[in-house]
Amino acid sequence: MNVVNQCRAWCAALLLLTCSPSLLAATPDDQLIVGMNMNNLLTLDPAAMTGNEVVGIVVNLYDGLVELDPQQLTNVRPALAERWEISADNRQLTFHLRDNVTFHSGNVLSSADVIWSMRRVLHLNLAQASVWKSYGFSTENVDQMITAPDARTVVIRLPKANDPKLVLYSLAALGSMVVLDSKTVQAQAVNNDWGNRWLTTHEAGSGPFRLDVWQAKDVLRISRDAHYWRGSPKLTRVIFRHLQESQTLRLMMEKGDLDIASNMAIPDVKALRHDPDLTIDAVQKGTIYYLAMSMKDDHFANPQVREALRYLVDYQGINKTLMAGYGTLHQRPIQSGMPATLPDPGYKLDVPRAKALLAAAGYPNGFDTTLRVLADQPFLNVAIAIQSTLMQGGIRAKIITGTGNQIYGAMRDRQFNLLVGRGGSGVEPHPHSSLRSLVYNPNNADSARLTNFQGWRTGFYDAQLNSMIDKALLERDVKQQQQDYFAIQQRYDQLIPALMPISQMTDSVVVNNRVQDYVPHPSATTFLRDVWKTPDSLAGGAQ
């Protein structure tokens, strides 16, 4: 080859690389690089966690007694418990533990660790205690209700009648009842905090991966546990990177710098649909986008004001223009797709009707208030749209943006006026899962601190509705139970609740086609232990 032709060849190669950024980079074959927004990643303590982001990390550091099959949610699979039985009276669950499990510290798993972990959730009384308190567990009765006849057996006696299937679903799906290495955590406890401060940035699990490092709003790295009881994971390492800008995530996926990206703006997701190297996984979740009102605020304690706001939201417009890829129109507290879910009531923007309601409530000229929202999409755009239609009715809402702790923290403290948010659990395949999170409020006192219940956060309380929810949960006749759930939704609607469902969440995850056996979980408990990657000629091994 002469010099001219050689030069042309080099130039052509350079041009090819320049025009094909995906050829410039490839992640290592044995590592998974995940891009995500970590603004809501506030703690790694399973008892304190809130939000989908942390759940997806915690379930790969710890194990629970059981888990849900991501492709058939009603299928409960064994985990630390190799088998279990439910008593004839539906009031007792007995779990038999595996005998080959060790924690990352080398300590051997025993029933004492399971019991201590469950006691810890209740005694700390943080976010994840709410569900178990609603089932009747308390710091006073937990020692009698959860016992260990021997080192390999755990017996859970239900304090009050319940559907044992729901309890199993909760143990499997919530992530709150993962089992901690009690000896390791107790050694790190300070001032009777049950190790909470230490576990904020550390872990004490038996899961497929160990925590290497977490630098808040920067990077979190986990490495495989070669001695994991199910067998060593196929990936040596998983790296989660904090990338807040959607365009950055898109560019890095195009270049091959990331294997998986979540929290992307839908326009960027759509732009990647035709990339032959990428796949878009869309998973519908039970989580609901909503507008919440605080009934601690005199304005929103008035049902006529709450009803006025019901008609100052352009549900159809928001879902059509802002929620494509994020969610679908839904106006009921029970997630769609269940036999117990009523059709939507069909609420629409109706400014004249809203103005009349406000005038009747004593606010003919409206009033000033605040609207809290995460500084992320789609939340911010939804809040701006709602601010605009509220203004048409005379309600002047100042938008306050912030991080998850600033926004949801104020809601957990019941120190807010209006809030655009997302919640509703729905992770368990049972109508009670949605109702418990969005509607149920067994104790409206500030001291109750039922912070994982949106009903408590908003100050919405109705004793009859609580009783109806309790009764429906225990109904054994399937047809009657469905009718009970219909009646609950009708009463909830008539009460003009403090939380208005707008859209049901769809989670879009962009995945490089080199990634194999990655199955996004509707409950956010996505397991990474079996994930692997096809080799790439430009990818190296672990460094």
Locations of regions flagged by a protein language model:
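Detector for C-terminal structural segments
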Residues: 53, 215, 312-340, 377-387, ...
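Gly/Pro-rich hinge or "lid" segments in bacterial periplasmic/extracellular proteins
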Residues: 70-71, 173-232, 237, 351-352, ...
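Ligand-site clamp/hinge motif
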Residues: 197, 225-271, 388, 396-398
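Surface-exposed binding/hinge segments that line
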Residues: 96, 134-187
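A structural "hinge/loop" feature
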Residues: 39-55, 77-80, 107, 129, ...
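Alpha-helical secondary-structure segments
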Residues: 33, 110-117, 151-157, 161, ...
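Aromatic- and charge-enriched surface segment that lines or borders ligand/interaction sites
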Residues: 82-128, 155-157, 165-166, 249-252, ...
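N-terminal lobe/hinge region of extracytoplasmic solute-binding protein
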Residues: 35-88, 119, 202-208
